[in-house]
């Protein structure tokens, strides 16, 4: 396994440019699992779980809420927690240290906007599903 990591590191060092694809696995490694009915979800969204039977973030994003107010209560809490209160963690910081000096472009389905705060150039990050911070009611 260690040899594999050395080979990957060497390939990164020798590459002229990098195309980085990032999806839920990266967020999960940072502790944000949109599929999980975990401690974090129950702590921050337990009221939505009790009231509507929502068991994870993904269900909450696509749930048919009875009112716009209840829908935006969920969305605004999610945006506040994941995009403003929680900062990117060591996985994102290490990724930037590993590749940030290279010519790169990132394509991601992650919407929590954790690439730019660690140093990645916003113009080199394409969030194909948008950014939660750009949501509008």
Model-predicted segments: where are they?
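Conserved catalytic core of sirtuin-type NAD+-dependent deacylases
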Residues: 1-137
């Amino acid at each position: 396994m260690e040899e594999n990591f050395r080979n990957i590191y060497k390939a990164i060092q020798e590459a002229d440019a990098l195309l980085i694809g990032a999806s839920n696995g990266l967020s999960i490694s940072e502790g944000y699992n949109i599929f999980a009915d975990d401690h974090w979800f129950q702590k921050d969204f337990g009221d939505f779980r009790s009231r509507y039977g929502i068991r994870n973030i993904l269900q909450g994003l696509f749930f048919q809420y009875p009112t716009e107010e209840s829908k935006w209560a969920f969305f605004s809490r999610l945006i506040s927690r994941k995009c403003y209160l929680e900062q990117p963690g060591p996985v994102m910081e290490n990724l930037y240290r590993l590749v940030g000096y290279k010519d790169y472009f990132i394509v991601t389905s992650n919407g929590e906007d954790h690439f730019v705060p660690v140093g990645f150039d916003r113009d080199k990050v394409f969030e194909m599903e948008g950014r939660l911070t750009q949501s509008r009611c």
